[in-house]
């Protein structure tokens, strides 16, 4: 026995179950694998593929194409159906879209050449007329010669006078912010210097007598309270004698 343990080592103890460590309830050990030759109690291997969790049970045994669904059924609404007639909106369409517009089409598209307001059948400018009656052309196309190409070449030279100032932009005018009162009220005409001087002189003449009277009253009050006034000394002397 000592020789056996020396060759193969001491027998190790099995690890403790997870319930003993506190991680969860203990699970039973897995069953031993079947013998390679198969025994009398061994079951034959299953040939059908097992469906993953969450798949329909009806499609579980249909083979590897269990994710395919049935094709959608035919619907009445397609791209070729008229939705106005399908939803019975003919009256509303005629009510809102059947009115004639007062303004012409050329008012909305002023840059297009030709008579836009008239239909193309009047002047044979419609696409259908070009398809039905194509224009008569020559059988072959001739290349452009060198003399004809000279008309498309650009030659250096001075600009004409009417085109010289086209790239120069005029300076923008600076609009000063005016008061709101000046916008609402009528503009007052400017007074001439003669009128303003005449008004100033009139005001001075009217205010002169009042100013003179006020100035005289102020002077009288100052003289009464000043020590140099003669009446002040006599009044003080009389008051002192009465006290004695």
From Swiss-Prot:
GO terms for molecular function: transcription coregulator activity. Residues 44-55, 234-244 have a biased composition (Low complexity). Pfam families: Med19. GO terms for biological process: positive regulation of transcription elongation by RNA polymerase II; positive regulation of transcription initiation by RNA polymerase II; RNA polymerase II preinitiation complex assembly. Residues 26-38 have a biased composition (Pro residues). The keyword Transcription regulation applies. Residues 1-67, 171-244 are annotated as: Disordered. Component of the Mediator complex, which is composed of MED1, MED4, MED6, MED7, MED8, MED9, MED10, MED11, MED12, MED13, MED13L, MED14, MED15, MED16, MED17, MED18, MED19, MED20, MED21, MED22, MED23, MED24, MED25, MED26, MED27, MED29, MED30, MED31, CCNC, CDK8 and CDC2L6/CDK11. The MED12, MED13, CCNC and CDK8 subunits form a distinct module termed the CDK8 module. Mediator containing the CDK8 module is less active than Mediator lacking this module in supporting transcriptional activation. Belongs to the Mediator complex subunit 19 family. This is Mediator of RNA polymerase II transcription subunit 19. It comes from Mus musculus (Mouse).
């Amino acid at each position: 026995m000592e020789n056996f343990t020396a060759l193969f080592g001491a027998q190790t103890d099995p690890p403790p179950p997870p319930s003993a460590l506190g991680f969860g309830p203990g699970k039973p050990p897995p069953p031993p694998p079947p013998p390679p030759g198969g025994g009398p109690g061994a079951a034959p291997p299953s040939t059908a593929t097992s469906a993953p969790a969450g798949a329909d049970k009806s499609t579980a045994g249909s083979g590897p194409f269990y994710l395919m669904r049935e094709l959608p059924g035919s619907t009445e609404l397609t791209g070729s159906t008229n939705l106005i007639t399908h939803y019975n909106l003919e009256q509303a369409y005629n009510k809102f879209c059947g009115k004639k517009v007062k303004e012409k089409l050329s008012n909305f598209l002023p840059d297009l050449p030709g008579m836009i307001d008239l239909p193309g059948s009047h002047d044979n400018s419609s696409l259908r007329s070009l398809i039905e009656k194509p224009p008569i052309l020559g059988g072959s196309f001739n290349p452009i010669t060198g003399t004809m190409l000279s008309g498309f070449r650009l030659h250096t030279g001075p600009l004409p006078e009417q085109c010289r100032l086209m790239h120069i932009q005029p300076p923008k005018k600076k609009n000063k912010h005016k008061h709101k009162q000046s916008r609402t009220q009528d503009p007052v005409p400017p007074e001439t210097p003669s009128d303003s001087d005449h008004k100033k002189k009139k005001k001075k003449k009217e205010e002169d007598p009042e100013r003179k009277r006020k100035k005289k009253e102020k002077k009288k009050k100052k003289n009464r309270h000043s020590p140099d006034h003669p009446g002040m000394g006599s009044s003080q002397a009389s008051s002192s004698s009465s006290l004695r």
